[in-house]
């Protein structure tokens, strides 16, 4: 819905203590395919159901895998409940939200770019505790002769302690 919300949720899952996190540079499609195969193996060996797992992936990495043009690359991507391509501008392991209503976010100094993230929906605890939307018509908008939409939300991004093996994070290497 909003880039900040996407970035917050993805960084939240990536920074949960106890989830599998691997950092490595992926220079080509073969390296990306090997990393994705290793992640799938880890998830499946942890007895997570791949059919309930979502793959969040950087479009560049996804393209490198697709460009291999082999059955192996297609098989590595099959079987997930869904595949979501996430722009690199909102795909970090840690972020800082801008304060005082100015909106937006930036990568935390300790944050790394995420290559891909696998999340089992049976592992994730995600819901909005409080959501407020406000629509201001042009008649009462004092800033401009236009509609104004305000959106404020507070949510939870956590994982069940006994199912943290259902989350796998692959970040860019140093």
Regions found by a protein language model. Name each.
Residues 67-174:
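Sequence/fold signature of self-assembling virion shell proteins
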Residues 42-60, 66:
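Extended amphipathic alpha-helical segments with heptad-repeat/coiled-coil character used for oligomerization
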Residues 1-20, 46-48, 55-56, 138, ...:
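Long, contiguous amphipathic alpha-helices that act as assembly "spine/axial" helices in icosahedral shell
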Residues 1-46, 169-174:
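Alpha-helical scaffold segments that mediate packing/assembly in large oligomeric complexes
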């Amino acid at each position: 819905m909003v880039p900040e919300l996407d970035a917050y949720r993805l960084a939240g899952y990536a920074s949960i203590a106890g989830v599998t996190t691997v950092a490595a540079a992926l220079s080509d499609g073969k390296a990306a395919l090997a990393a994705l195969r290793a992640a799938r193996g880890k998830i499946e060996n942890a007895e997570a159901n791949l059919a309930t797992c979502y793959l969040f992936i950087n479009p560049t990495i996804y393209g490198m895998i697709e460009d291999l043009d082999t059955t192996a690359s297609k098989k590595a991507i099959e079987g997930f409940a869904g595949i979501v391509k996430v722009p690199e501008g909102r795909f970090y392991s840690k972020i800082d939200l801008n304060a005082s209503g100015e909106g937006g976010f930036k990568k935390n100094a300790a944050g790394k770019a995420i290559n891909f993230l696998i999340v089992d929906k049976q592992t994730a605890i995600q819901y909005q505790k409080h959501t407020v939307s406000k629509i201001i018509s042009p008649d009462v908008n004092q800033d401009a002769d236009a509609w104004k939409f305000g959106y404020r939300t507070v949510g939870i991004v956590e994982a069940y302690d006994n199912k943290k093996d259902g989350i796998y994070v692959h970040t860019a290497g140093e």
